[in-house]
């Protein structure tokens, strides 16, 4: 045991020299890691890290790290995609490694990923992975804070409100919101595209998904509350205890309380008025669980928060990245604009849902953006039972992961995998031929219920933007990926625009 502790201390000491470069904050971080490493090494020594595998079972290849506890956290944090692709080349589709005291097993490629997407919740559990992130943001009693059977009922209620009849109403709402938002942009200039689209996504989603009462209260102060609440989706929130007095945690918790109060008032007003409005708020107010119990006001408010914020990330990042892909390829951008005239009419009348469905090139551009820049790099579950895949057995306690980003650019599956080519979907591609090669919205029991709304939202916003402006890169700069956030956003996303001549 003493040898183990000495080994851990020696390695951590070397790591401090290499990693911190004398930086005090970094040294304190490593010191904390060392303390945690002692606990980790003790558990390792006494054999309590995981139950033994069945006799004859073979563990996945393990990528050894010289740094206890932290493991590969630094290398993975700097370049996660390259790390996973290199590991795939060296070890194959299934491999394990340690970060911050947890063992992660990745399943790369469609065949290996099938284990996660086809699994039952009692074998690969989602709540134990995501609850510490989502519960402080959405609230108690919804999403990953409840048993999976209850969550599935809640998703079914929300999905019933995300229907074509509502989508038909949403198109005109989103178009009007978009036109109003871009009035402030003027004739030409340079703007932060990601910030702008994040704001617009909140405005349009709130109007469509929350109803006019809640949208009418969405001013700058409330928008900041949403931003503070959204700040709860962070690496710190996932890694650290929620009771720590961090500024971001305090802002998140205050925003949660204030937004809930806004929702409570809107819900109470709707209930008291007896007015029946055909929107998702009304759908939830009239929904019941299988046992006949109606949703409480707190559950309705939490589900509305979850519906907005879960979709906001997908739509804002995808919309922004697509803008830069179109700005880089002006020929493609012009084709998308001409498609507007071909499908909708030369005079570009107000958009309709049926026209939106026929904008096939724009649809393929969204699909290709989601392939190369999926908002979420990793989908994760906690192994509760031994699971076999590709001849290996994954022990209980492993964090089992699939990376849409890696699967969607795997060289064994995709031709010209790094090229932005929307026309690849006109022919046979892994997206249609391999079940889990293309999974930006997940698959199986946890597939995103907001996928169709996201397409309606993004297509309507970009149809309107293409009618208003031409877009260009600034001095040829195409944003790199910001891997420091949970959602992989564009770095320095400034774009140049000029109003189209009529």
Curated annotation (Swiss-Prot):
InterPro entries, A to Z: CYP450_sterol_14alpha_dmase, Cyt_P450, Cyt_P450_CS, Cyt_P450_E_grp-IV, Cyt_P450_sf
The positions annotated for binding heme are 448
Q: Name one Pfam family in it.
A: p450
Explain the post-translational modification.
Ubiquitinated by MARCHF6, leading to proteasomal degradation.
Q: How does it sit in the membrane?
A: Single-pass membrane protein
Q: What are the EC numbers? A: 1.14.14.154
Family per record: Belongs to the cytochrome P450 family.
What is the official name of this protein in its record? Lanosterol 14-alpha demethylase
Organism (species): Bos taurus (Bovine)
Q: What gene does this protein come from?
A: CYP51A1
């Amino acid at each position: 045991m003493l040898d183990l502790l000495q080994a851990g201390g020696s390695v951590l000491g070397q790591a401090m020299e290499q990693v911190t470069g004398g930086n005090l904050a970094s040294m304190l971080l490593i010191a904390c890691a060392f303390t945690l490493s002692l606990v980790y090494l003790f558990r390792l020594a006494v054999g309590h890290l995981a139950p033994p595998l069945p006799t004859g079972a073979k563990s996945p290849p393990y990528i050894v790290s010289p740094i206890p506890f932290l493991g590969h956290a630094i290398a993975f944090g700097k370049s996660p995609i390259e790390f996973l692709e290199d590991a795939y080349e060296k070890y194959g589709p299934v491999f394990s490694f340690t970060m911050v005291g947890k063992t992660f097993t990745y399943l790369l490629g469609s065949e290996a990923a099938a284990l996660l997407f086809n699994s039952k919740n009692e074998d690969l559990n989602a709540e134990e992975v995501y609850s510490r992130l989502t519960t402080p943001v959405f609230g108690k009693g919804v999403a990953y804070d409840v048993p999976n059977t209850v969550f599935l009922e809640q998703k079914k209620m929300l999905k019933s409100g995300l229907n074509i009849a509502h989508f038909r109403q949403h198109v005109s709402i989103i178009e009007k919101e978009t036109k109003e938002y871009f009035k402030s942009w003027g004739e030409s200039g340079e703007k932060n595209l990601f910030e702008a689209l994040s704001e617009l996504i909140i405005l349009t989603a709130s109007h469509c998904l929350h109803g006019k009462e809640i949208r009418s209260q969405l001013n700058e102060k409330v928008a900041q509350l949403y931003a503070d609440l959204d700040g709860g989706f962070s690496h710190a929130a996932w890694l650290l205890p929620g009771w720590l007095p961090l500024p971001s945690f305090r802002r998140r918790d205050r925003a949660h309380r204030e937004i809930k109060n806004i929702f409570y008032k809107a819900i109470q007003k709707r209930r008291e008025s007896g007015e029946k409005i055909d929107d998702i708020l009304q759908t939830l107010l009239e929904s019941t669980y299988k046992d006949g119990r109606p949703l409480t006001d707190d559950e309705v408010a939490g589900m509305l928060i979850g519906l907005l914020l879960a979709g906001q990330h997908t739509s804002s990042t995808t919309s922004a990245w697509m803008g830069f892909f179109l700005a880089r390829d002006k020929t493609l951008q012009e084709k998308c604009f001409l498609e507007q005239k071909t499908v909708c009419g030369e005079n570009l009348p107000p958009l309709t849902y049926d026209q939106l469905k026929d904008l096939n090139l724009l649809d393929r551009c969204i699909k290709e953006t989601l392939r190369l820049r999926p908002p979420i790099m990793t989908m994760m579950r906690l192994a509760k039972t031994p699971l076999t895949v590709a001849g290996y057995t994954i022990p209980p306690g492993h964090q089992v992961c699939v990376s849409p980003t890696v699967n969607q650019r795997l060289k064994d599956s995709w031709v010209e995998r790094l090229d932005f080519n929307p026309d690849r979907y006109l022919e046979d591609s892994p997206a249609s031929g391999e079940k889990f090669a293309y999974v930006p919205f997940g698959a199986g029991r946890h597939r995103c219920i907001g996928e169709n709304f996201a397409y309606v939202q993004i297509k309507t916003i970009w149809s309107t933007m293409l009618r208003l402006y031409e877009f260009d890169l600034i001095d040829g700069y195409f944003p790199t990926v910001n891997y420091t956030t949970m959602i992989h956003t564009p770095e320095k996303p400034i774009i140049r625009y000029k109003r189209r001549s009529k």
